[in-house]
Regions:
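N-terminal secretion-targeting helices of virulence/extracellular proteins
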Residues: 1-87
Length: 87
């Protein structure tokens, strides 16, 4: 008979990997911000470009990080529920 439900350990490992990926993306976002702000570029184009990074692109990446963390929590919660049902 095929298994129905979650492989709890597999779910927890997946959630951990998703959390790790979110952390790596968060660190990458910080490094990219340093790169974008770290070279000499003066003028209105520079201001607009850097403002676009801060207000749009960086914000999008930050939202992805939050979504990944939320999804990881969802998987962990599902694993906990599966464990309770299985016991």
């Amino acid at each position: 008979m095929p298994m129905k439900g979650m492989d709890v350990e597999g779910g927890r490992q997946s959630a951990q990997q998703i959390t790790q990926g979110a952390s790596e993306l968060e660190q990458l976002t910080g490094r990219l911000t340093q790169v974008i702000e770290g070279f000499e570029w003066i003028g209105p184009d520079a201001e607009r470009t850097r403002q676009a990074w801060q207000s749009d692109y960086r914000t999008m990446l930050t939202n992805v990080v939050a979504s990944l963390q939320e999804f990881s929590t969802l998987i962990n919660n599902q694993a906990q529920e599966q464990e309770q049902v299985s016991n």
